[in-house]
Amino acid sequence: MIIVTGGAGFIGSAFVWKLNSEGIDDILIVDRLGTSEKWKNLVSLRFEDYLHKDIFFDMVCDDDLPFEAGRVEAIVHMGACSSTTERDADYLWENNFAYTRTLAEWALDHDIRFIYASSAATYGDGTQGFSDEHAKIPELRPINMYGYSKQVFDLWVLRHKLENQMAGIKFFNVFGPNEYHKGDMTSVIFKAFHQIRETGKVRLFKSYLPQYPDGGQMRDFVYVKDCVNAMWWLLQNPETNGVFNLGTGKARTWNDLINAVYAAMDRKPNIEYIEMPDGLRNQYQYFTEAEMTKLKKAGFRFDFSTLEDSVRDYVCNYLQKSDPHLGNLK
């Protein structure tokens, strides 16, 4: 059995889709569905069971799961509050750090593979670079509580010298199908697609640094299908451990991204640059780019999709379809 926490969420459900495509359906999904629409991510997926995250956590704390621990091959821990604007620091600490620590300890106690989600938000404003070398991690200074909640678990792993016993993934700007429930945290591609359909125009934030023109701010945009391929590789290579970046390794501009959406929709670009909210200016990243040397040295050999190809697949095969969710046949 493979346990996927956050298994109804964006990356988690995409990974379940990947597991299904590899013929695996002995999967326990752990999540909190609540009143959101993310249950729709599960409809086309095959899995053994679902547990609410709080019930699962209590079972782990009591070491009393409804199955033998020896049946569990891996825990892929994607569950977290991923909102970069969440202000409740206590909630983020408990939900993103303490919960993860408890699962990691349980996995280690039972010799279970543990793969967890860190984040590129740990890099803060990027002035410390984007190296995933372990010696560099303590130097990072996140600029929001979400990033810090991820950073503090990476530091816990290093402090307890566990980096050779589990794998952490610093996801960069992930986009793709099954993100639809995320509201304000959906990708700009998703938002742009709907803006174009409704108004023909896309709005982007202006730049406030002279070295970046409006729309010239850069991100490492990575397709969720590429991410789950990397996650599958880590699952298949349990001797590969540590904290790894996961991006394409090539930053592109917001203008590139929006132009790719227009091209996929066969429309002429029309971009309006708007003022950035004051509260966002002091925590805005102008440049992110994953340094991918470490994962490649570990043996990962995979060509990431180009931005244009990824956007076209997302728009044409999902966003423009009546059911845009990942399914076993796609």
Where are the model-predicted features located?
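N-terminal Rossmann NAD(P)H-binding glycine-rich loop of SDR-like oxidoreductase domains
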Residues: I3-E22
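NAD(P)H-binding glycine-rich loop region in Rossmannoid oxidoreductase-like domains
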Residues: S44, K53-D54, M59-N95
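Catalytic helix-loop patch of NAD(P)-dependent Rossmann-fold dehydrogenases
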Residues: E94, A98-T102, D109, R113, ...
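C-terminal "lid/loop" region of Rossmann-like NAD(P)-dependent oxidoreductases
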Residues: S207-D214, V243, I258, D266-F287
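Glycine/proline-rich active-site loop of Rossmann-fold NAD(P)-dependent oxidoreductases
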Residues: V174-F190, E198, L209, P213-Q217, ...
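Glycine-rich phosphate-binding loop and adjoining beta1-alpha1-beta2 segment
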Residues: I29-F57
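Conserved C-terminal active-site "lid" loop/helix of NAD(P)H-dependent oxidoreductases
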Residues: V224, D278-R301
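Amphipathic terminal alpha-helices
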Residues: S305-K330
